[in-house]
Amino acid sequence: MTNYNEKIKKVLDGIIANMSENKEKYVIDPKKNFIRNRKLPFETMIKLILSMKGNTLNKELYDFFGKNPEEIVSSSAFVQQRTKISEQFFIDLFHNFNNSMTDMKTFKGYKIYAVDGSDINIAFDADAPTYIRPQHTKKGELTKGFNQYHLNAIYDVLNRVYVDAKLQPRPQLNERRMFLDMLQDMNLPIKTIFIADRGYPSWNFFANFKHKKNAEYVVRVRDSENLLVKHLPMIELDIDRKTIATCNTKKGKLSGYSYFTKKKIESGDWDFGEEEELNFRIVRFKISDTTYETIMTSLPRDKFSIEDIKKLYAMRWGIETSFRQLKYVIGLTNFHAKKDSFIVQEIFAKLTMYNFCERIISAAVVKQDNNRKYSYQVNYTMGMQICLDFFRSLVKTDNVYSLILKYIEAIKPGRSDVRKLKPKTFVCFTYRVAA
């Protein structure tokens, strides 16, 4: 186990070194940028951006250079060097790191991927494509304008790593289209189940899965909106349904098919021909005395029971937990820039570091005591802090797992709480912890 964290770090360091050798692909001007020896060469800049947490920029530089007055550089020098780096480096680094690792955990031989999105608040800029204009509330009050990116992500819930991600300016939000673009680009060597919530299902969504090798879906649907579901009795059930999606409106009405206008094809909401036969399995189960959940899936009944479907959909919560850790442990809420390209750099840097930390933590084995009431697991918040310090070489290789296992917490299954939604704003540069 001790050598595993060193192996992960060597893999990431090796990828950074190899990509840095071809830095001309990732700089704004290959003829001028990073051609002379400076205090902040290309590879150092990359590791510095990867290692940043949520402090002020000066504090990040102070920590990175070991508090050595001969080594520390000014924030303006850092920004000047950063301007020369394309955000594409960090996007490619995220994918290259994933491609270099083998994440083995499966459920009945299937990879389990959750699909979701999360809004990311950034600094105010009324001229940016991320700007959301003031709107009137139900009370007639005018809100303030603000800026957001939307992170569309695919997350491996068993191996606890981000598999793919795409960014959109929040005003251009289209989660379904972003997911289908990622799905179409993915290579799936083994069977994979994608779990999604109510905002994702559409005829185009289902048709894409029909044509994608090794891709299966488990998706929650709205009882009142889905044509195949809304007339079903409100009881527990497990049935099959079939429809033909067609853009021939007249034929659709006469035959009882699911039809849509040709505008959907023109707008990119339909990726196939005029007709597509679609088959579904519809599962409905109770989640309380008065509430039911309705799931549509492509999984075969002989391999996956209703209990399996219920368990799979519950796994989707893993991506919600990951967003919280990504934002408030890794530091995605605390950016060090206003410029869009710098923000994209930091978002993909944080995704890479999240995966780096999780892959190390996954090898930590917590010894269970039969005399204890609960089973125990690693405290992921502290585990990630230790891994980030290890990346900065502030923690010795041999001490990583002994430190991680100092911080464990009880697993208390069955707990639930009402989700508390609160509006959040960008964390201003002048309101950062400098300790």
Map each language-model feature to its residues.
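Single, function-defining residue in the core of a domain
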Residues: 1-55, 63-64, 72, 77-85, ...
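Short Lys/Arg-enriched helix C-cap and helix-to-coil transition segments
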Residues: 89-104
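Conserved beta-strand elements of the Class I
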Residues: 111-113
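Short Pro/Gly-enriched beta-strand edge/turn motifs at strand-loop
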Residues: 132-138, 263-268
